[in-house]
C-alpha cells in the first residue's frame, strides 16, 4: 500500500520529534555524567542500595561483547548500525499501528544515541549500574533503555495485532457459518404443510 504524501510527511514529522527528543535526552545525560565523573577515576555515585552511577566506556557491543576486537570492529559497528537504523526507519514509516510507530521510534532514538557516541567518541559511554548483593547487571545507558523499551512495545504490538487478526478471522468464520446455514434453510425444499 502506497502512503499518501501528507501521511508520509506527518509520520516523518512525528517520528523525527520523538527520535530527536530521545537522542537529546540520551546525549545530555551522557554529557553530564562524563563531565561530572571523568575527573574522579573510579568514583561511583551510590544512588540507592541497588543502583550506582559509574564512568564506563564500552568499546564493544551490548554488555561489552567483542571489546577485545575494538580496533577492527568499530568501523564495522558504525556501518552495520547505520544500515540497521535506516532499515528500522523504513519499517517505522510502513507501520500501521501506534505501537509499531512508538516502538520503532524508541529503538531508532536509542540506536542513534549510541551511534553518535561511537562516531564522535570512539566508544559508547555507559553509566547506569544495577546490582543486588553478588549479582551485578552490565552497565548501560539511557539509549539502551530506549532500545529495550522500544523492543518491548514492538513485541506487545505484534501480539496485540496477532490477537486482533485471530479474533477477526474467528468472527468472519462464524459469520460465514451463519450465512451458510441461513442459505441452506432458504434453499431447502418446502414441506407439504407449508402449502396450506
UniProtKB/Swiss-Prot annotation:
It is found in: Cell inner membrane. The active site is at 126, 144. One of its GO terms (molecular function) is aspartic-type endopeptidase activity. GO terms for biological process: proteolysis. It is a multi-pass membrane protein. It comes from the Bacteria. Its EC number is 3.4.23.36. GO terms for cellular component: plasma membrane. Keywords: Aspartyl protease, Cell inner membrane, Cell membrane, Hydrolase, Membrane, Protease, Transmembrane, Transmembrane helix. The keyword Cell division does not apply. Pathway: Protein modification; lipoprotein biosynthesis (signal peptide cleavage). The chain crosses the membrane at residues 75-95, 97-117, 135-155. The keyword Cytoplasm does not apply. It catalyses: Release of signal peptides from bacterial membrane prolipoproteins. Hydrolyzes -Xaa-Yaa-Zaa-|-(S,diacylglyceryl)Cys-, in which Xaa is hydrophobic (preferably Leu), and Yaa (Ala or Ser) and Zaa (Gly or Ala) have small, neutral side chains. It is an enzyme of class 3 (hydrolase). It holds the Pfam family Peptidase_A8. Belongs to the peptidase A8 family. This protein specifically catalyzes the removal of signal peptides from prolipoproteins. This is Lipoprotein signal peptidase. The gene is lspA.
